């Protein structure tokens, strides 16, 4: 299975389709900037939140392949306090916050503020294999986002103090584990693309971009990226999982939920997190057996399979497992995430 499909050239850029808001909308969405001292730039951050009627309805993540999810841009926030979930996206087609709207929007509807930075280099016109492979900078993006949201006047009086969690999908799952305390092994990262056996799609892009992981400065890759403000982490089909220093898992002190997509024994090694879950003292592990890695993408539009065939796209981005639709799999993942973050952030210890 290929993990990150680098097909951005054929994908219509994310569109925000404006319509008058209606009283039935309950989720707001807002953009802000987060200063990143690590990267020397400001990060674009998308925030979903429980909202009152108002603003304009927008469709986030809509493209010629994928169905968008509606929210109300700049709607007034509901007058209450909410836990905060930091959301980390993957790379390629899932390489932006809007691609995660299918899970962010219902979590906001469940009473969470969800904030997702755009990790630089992962997709779009500024796509960069070198930046994408600097996995150790991604947790710092979440840390910068947390600081920015806590300081933002629009949100700061609506956040429950000390109630912060991290959620990541695919490469974002790697990020969620890292901010919980997992450390990258620089030697394993350097050797990750020595073969195509681990991640053919990603590593082909890395090589075509002229990036030699052995030649990169990976000295900072093994640092501790944990943020003590994070109380809980959830990783859905995290990848790569096989570049971590296994000894670091024992030092993770917060609860961690890990979900793999696929049947045990059929999950590719780079995403199989069953072993690392056993190495953590407070981890729980589950699988969604009739799903695939591509199930974390938004629902495909009816014409998407034809586009995939005509463009000779090698990755079956619209294929799931067996028996259920993507919408049904999404409903299960949303329920799992909502239950996990409610337990971790809405229940007093």
Task: List the model feature ranges, each with a label.
Residues 24-87, 109, 304:
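Domain-level recognition of soluble alpha/beta enzyme cores
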Residues 67-70, 74-82, 87-127, 265-268:
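Short substrate-entry loop that stabilizes the transition state in hydrolases
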Residues 131-157, 161, 190-206, 210, ...:
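Alpha/beta-hydrolase active-site loop
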Residues 147-150, 173-185:
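Short glycine-enriched nucleophile-adjacent loop
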Residues 166-168:
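Short beta-strand immediately N-terminal to the catalytic nucleophile in serine-hydrolase-like folds
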Residues 244, 265-272:
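Conserved alpha/beta-hydrolase "acid-adjacent" motif
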Residues 252, 258-260:
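Short beta-strand/loop motif that positions the catalytic acidic residue
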Residues 302-349:
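Catalytic active-site module of serine/aspartate enzymes centered on a nucleophile-bearing elbow/loop
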């Amino acid at each position: 299975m290929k993990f990150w499909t680098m097909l951005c050239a054929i994908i219509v850029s994310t569109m925000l389709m404006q319509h008058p808001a209606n009283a039935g909308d309950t989720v707001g969405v807002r953009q802000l900037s987060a200063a990143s001292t690590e990267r020397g730039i400001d990060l674009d951050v998308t925030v979903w939140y429980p909202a009152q009627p108002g603003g304009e309805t927008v469709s986030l993540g809509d493209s010629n392949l994928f169905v968008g999810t509606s929210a109300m841009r700049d709607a007034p926030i509901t007058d209450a306090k909410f836990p905060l979930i930091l959301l980390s996206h993957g790379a390629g087609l899932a390489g932006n916050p809007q691609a995660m709207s299918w899970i962010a929007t219902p979590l906001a509807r469940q009473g969470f503020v969800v904030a997702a930075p755009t990790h630089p280099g992962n997709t779009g016109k500024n796509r960069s294999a070198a930046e994408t492979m600097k996995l150790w900078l991604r947790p710092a993006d979440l840390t910068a986002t947390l600081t920015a949201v806590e300081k933002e006047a629009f949100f700061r009086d609506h956040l429950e103090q000390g109630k912060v969690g991290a959620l990541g999908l695919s490469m974002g799952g790697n990020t969620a584990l890292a901010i919980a305390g997992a450390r990258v092994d620089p030697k394993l990262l350097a050797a990750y693309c020595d073969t195509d056996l681990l991640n053919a799609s990603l590593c082909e892009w890395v090589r075509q971009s002229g990036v030699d992981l052995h030649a990169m400065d990976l000295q900072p890759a093994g640092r501790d990226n944990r943020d003590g403000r994070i109380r809980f982490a959830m990783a859905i089909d995290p990848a790569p999982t096989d570049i971590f220093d296994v000894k670091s898992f024992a030092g993770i002190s917060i609860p961690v939920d890990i979900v793999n997509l696929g049947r045990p024994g059929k999950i590719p090694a780079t995403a199989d997190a069953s072993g690392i879950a056993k190495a953590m003292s407070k981890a729980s592990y589950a699988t969604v057996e009739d799903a695939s890695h591509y199930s974390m993408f938004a629902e495909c539009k009816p014409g998407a399979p034809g586009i995939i065939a005509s463009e000779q796209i090698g990755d079956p981005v619209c294929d799931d497992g067996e028996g259920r639709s993507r919408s049904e799999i999404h409903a299960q993942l949303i329920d799992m995430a909502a239950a996990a973050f409610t337990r971790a952030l809405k229940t007093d210890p």
